[in-house]
Amino acid sequence: MKKINIWMLGLSSLFAMNSCGEDFLDVDHYDILQPEIMFTSEDFVNQGLNGLYDTFLPLSTGSEDIEKNWNIKPHLAFSNYPALDCQADGWDNEFTRHAWLADKDMFKVAWQYAYRAISRANTFLEQLKEAEVAIFAEGQTGKDKIEAQARAIRGYWYYYLAQNFGRVPMLKEGETYVNTPSKPRAESLDETYDFIISDLSYAAEHLDWIPENGDYGRITKGMAMSYEALTYMYKKDFTSAKALLKDIIDHGPYELTPCYGEIHQFDNYWSKESVWEVSFLHWGNLDWSANSTTDDIWWGTYLTAASEYGGWGALYISHEFARSFEPGDKRRQYSIVCKGETQPYTGEVIGATEGREGDFVGSENMPNNYSIKLWKGKAGNPVYTPISAFHLRYAAVLLNYAECCFQTEGADSSEGWNQIKMIRDRAWGNMEVGRSPIDNFPFEFNHSTIEVPDAKAYYTQYRVDKGYTSDVWKVALTIERRHEFLAEYSFWYDLCRSEMAKEFLECEYPQNNGQRYNTDGEPCTPRTFSFDSNRMLYPIPTQEILTNAAISQADQNPGY
């Protein structure tokens, strides 16, 4: 059984080799290394650093279901379910009803997971100060690169905490939840954001676009700059964010994957579209026993496939989302399968089983439509899913840059609309022309370019038809993100950050007294709740309030 310790690694290999022949971060098993040993050689320092990278993976030996399914739980719930395009039954259905409470296990585990990583980073950074420059092959430059990666990891986890919970306790170098169990929340969100920016800016300054030693899976300049830009966007400093994103676009190594449908595929690791991912590799053993040798595994298929065909708790997709695509937008066929359609990777027909034929299924009447981003084979074959968790793609960089252009240049920004056009050209298949699909790809590539409807004209009419009141560019970005990032890691956060959450829900999922069919007879989401702006942040976990003497119920986020 693996142990979890600040100076210990818990996996046999975090990243291995891909078809391009590039190297990946390789993490071997090591025994506990005490600080007095850790900082006697560069190899030992890197072993300690690799222990920080371990915090991005699930904890297969954890006592909590959420620890074992990290990167699916709680991520899908936090970043998707409240927007209602993705829906859940069972214990997670409360997110679809906007009825979550502070004692929800997901909040507790998310908080603990993040602070476990931050505590490791703080201890590592405090000890790194004492390391002699002479032990590093590149001298001070080498030491700075180690510090940059550790600070970026800490900055990432504080970003994760801030976007979910707002103001949080800011533990600094040397502080952990063991030696600093009671610390109040930051005085302001700006204090939290500025700390994150400091960490990520330092990382961007000292790291390159290509990961250190060519080990894909390590923090890069592009990853640090992308999350730094997002933090500036939360601060409404779109000028600073825009400059960072423009630098990434002009100088970074990133490109859009020509076919949208080839992103979420077995063995697609660190393509040029990937800015930050957690790679789940195609190990020789992906059977039930795989969790005895690595944490680098997840149940992507089992946790998203239709229950009709072996899924444990399907990732249901709303009827509204399924109807929301323009003709020709291939993201629809690449992302979901609906009632009456054939799952393209398994040949299974949705709704072919007696009792599962309806628009809604199960005791909670969930929509009979499903995401296929992680459902690329029959449930159980293999048990674990060798598809990466793409936390940040280049497509997000482009759309974030578009948002900053509109915010700083106005609604007619040609640069902003050009980024949206690029995303839509890929969505309609124009980047597929002249290329061959990967092996066993169940869709045909476009053979000639087609004319994509002008985004500004389309969304001008869409805005009127749906009843939006925000600027056309805001509506365009919202719906493009909706279609681009279904069941990924950003949509609800983007809605909240851009102040579009209420408007999106009112226009796409209006309250309807719990009806399952609209006035046109189409199946729809039964929405009864009223929008509460307090729900744009999640609650400080009940356990934290009970155990942290510096935080009381009076410090809880409003509305909880």
Which residues does each PLM region occupy?
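Bacterial Sec-dependent N-terminal signal peptides
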Residues: M1-H29
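An aromatic- and glycine-enriched ligand-binding surface/loop that stacks and positions planar moieties
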Residues: G21-W91, V168, Y193, S201-Y202, ...
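Long, intrinsically disordered, low-complexity segments
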Residues: S19-F24, D65, W70-K73, C86, ...
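C-terminal substrate/ligand-recognition segments
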Residues: T342-D425
